[in-house]
């Protein structure tokens, strides 16, 4: 499994043999280096990809590429000559260079996929190859088979709310939680093990196998194949459904005004309050791009005005993606995906209403700017620990709209002195703008392009230059670990 994306990218054949090696143009390269087979294969994929990007600037992509500057300062390769060589000869010369020499120029990878090695998982291989994912094969839940009961007390308490940590909706107050039932152990009666995966140095991480991975999305074979059946709305309109089933949570209802605040994109936003089980079931069968649910989820299902709708009873769901912004909504969200949704965002534990409202608003704004489900949640987790109580089920590659910049990006800003600021820009590849796309931040005087994945660069800007950068488009900005928005920032107040 781990070698599939590399073989796909190179157009290579995979054969059974006694040694793990890559053969190219008469040369042979070991794939079982000191860091192990999986890590070595990942390094080879990244190295060949990087040097391919640089070599292609000799052809139709005649741009000033930042990665080329870094590579040329570290190695002596004749890229004009390499451009005219056959692929096998190119690969052979690429791999003569030690990876560590190029490491600083390798872009942050988009996706790491942890796939439990089982014949049932084989059908996901073509989809992972298409995304050029780094594929790893854990033997079971977590790097050492650790379950939630094996984790540290701090992590365990993350899933099992202690008495007094949150209040149920029956205890009305400023910090009531989005749950109407007090669970004795704080769990959602999950029938699968919650566990940790080995961390990944990629923007996104997904898992294929049994169990519920902490800090990663969860995909199944069926959900990958659902990508092939996706049919975009014929009229070109982006349809969003906002459902609020608790009047005390109406503060989050303003997300209906957030979706659709984009020029040149036609939206159809509808808001529904206090819906019944039949009405919610009908909404879920609607051909809509996104459902933003605000309310309660209990063991009986999604709370409605006349009872509970158990998503496991639904035969069909036509909403593409969703946010179930309620306590312990994993099981109901999993059922929505099983019934036909492409992907969604759910919670694994109780969430305070104030936290859920804040995250719900941020989700709306990030999706409205072209972020995928997984990249959006990863960005939120950087500045809000409680966002780690949320996870993606189904296809985390799903997006609501495309970014104005093509590849969406976020900026981090620090003031250096009265007139100068340090600005770091991070890019987040999507299904429409995947690994290999190039981009150029809108910074005055900058003519350099970058492979648009992860940290592009850090710039020193004057106050006027920073103002121009922030005015270019609405984008998320991190200031002192706070998530802000470029359209709301006064540079003089940073």
Language model features: what each stretch is:
Residues 320, 325-494:
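Active-site-proximal C-terminal subdomain of hydrolase catalytic domains
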Residues 27-35, 284-289, 360-361:
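Short, surface-exposed amphipathic charged segments that create phosphate/polyanion-binding patches used
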Residues 13-15, 291-292, 343-347:
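Short hydrophobic alpha-helical runs that function as membrane-insertion/retention elements
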Residues 243-247, 254-335, 477-479, 483-493:
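Catalytic-core segments of thiol-dependent peptidases
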Residues 28-35, 250-251, 332-334:
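Short, surface-exposed beta-strand/loop "edge" segments at domain boundaries and coil↔beta transitions
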Residues 1-152, 158, 162:
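Long, folded non-catalytic interaction modules
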Residues 4-10, 257-260, 338-341, 361-362:
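Short, solvent-exposed amphipathic alpha-helical segments in soluble enzyme
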Residues 111, 115-290:
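A domain-level signal for caspase-like cysteine endopeptidase catalytic cores
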């Amino acid at each position: 499994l781990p070698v599939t994306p590399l073989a796909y990218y190179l157009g290579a054949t995979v054969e059974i043999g006694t040694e793990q090696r890559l053969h190219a143009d008469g040369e042979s390269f070991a794939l079982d280096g000191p860091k192990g087979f999986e890590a070595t294969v990942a390094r080879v994929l990244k190295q060949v990809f990087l040097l391919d990007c640089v070599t292609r600037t000799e052809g139709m992509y005649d741009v000033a590429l930042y990665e080329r500057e870094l590579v040329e300062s570290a190695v002596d390769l004749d890229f004009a000559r390499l451009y005219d060589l056959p692929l096998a000869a190119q690969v052979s010369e690429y791999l003569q260079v030690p990876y560590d020499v190029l490491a600083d120029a390798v872009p942050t990878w988009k996706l790491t996929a942890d796939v439990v090695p089982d014949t049932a998982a084989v059908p996901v291989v073509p989809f992972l190859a298409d995304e050029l994912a780094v594929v790893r094969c854990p033997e079971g839940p977590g790097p050492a088979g650790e379950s939630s009961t094996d984790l540290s007390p701090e992590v365990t308490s993350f899933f099992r709310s202690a008495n007094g940590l949150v209040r149920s909706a029956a205890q009305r107050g400023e910090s009531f939680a989005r749950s109407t039932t007090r669970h004795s152990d704080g769990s959602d009666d999950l029938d699968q093990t919650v566990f940790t995966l080995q961390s990944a140095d990629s923007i996104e991480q997904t898992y294929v196998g049994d169990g519920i991975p902490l800090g990663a999305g969860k995909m199944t074979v069926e959900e990958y194949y659902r990508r092939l059946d996706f049919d975009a709305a014929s009229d070109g309109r982006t349809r969003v459904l906002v459902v609020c089933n608790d009047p005390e949570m109406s503060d989050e209802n303003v997300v209906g005004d957030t979706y659709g605040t984009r020029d040149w994109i036609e939206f159809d936003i509808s808001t529904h309050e206090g819906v019944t089980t039949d009405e919610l079931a009908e909404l879920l069968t609607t051909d809509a791009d996104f459902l933003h649910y605000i309310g309660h989820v209990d063991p009986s299902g999604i709370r409605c005005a006349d009872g509970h709708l158990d998503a496991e009873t639904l035969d069909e769901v036509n909403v593409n993606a969703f946010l179930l912004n309620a306590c312990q909504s994993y099981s109901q969200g999993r059922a929505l995906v099983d019934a036909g949704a492409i992907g969604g965002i759910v919670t694994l534990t109780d969430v305070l209403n104030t936290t859920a409202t804040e995250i719900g608003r941020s989700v709306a704004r990030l999706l409205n700017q072209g972020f995928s489900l997984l990249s959006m949640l990863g960005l939120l987790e950087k500045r809000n620990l409680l966002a780690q109580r949320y996870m993606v089920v189904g296809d985390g590659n799903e997006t609501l709209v495309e970014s104005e910049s093509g590849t969406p990006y976020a900026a981090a800003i620090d003031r250096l002195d009265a007139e100068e600021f340090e600005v770091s820009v991070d890019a987040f590849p999507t299904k429409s703008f995947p690994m290999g796309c190039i981009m150029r931040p809108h910074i005055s005087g900058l003519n350099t392009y970058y492979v648009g994945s992860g940290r592009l660069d850090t710039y020193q800007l004057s106050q006027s230059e920073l103002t121009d950068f922030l005015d270019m488009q609405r984008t998320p900005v991190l200031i002192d670990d706070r998530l802000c928005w470029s359209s709301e920032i006064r540079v003089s107040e940073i």
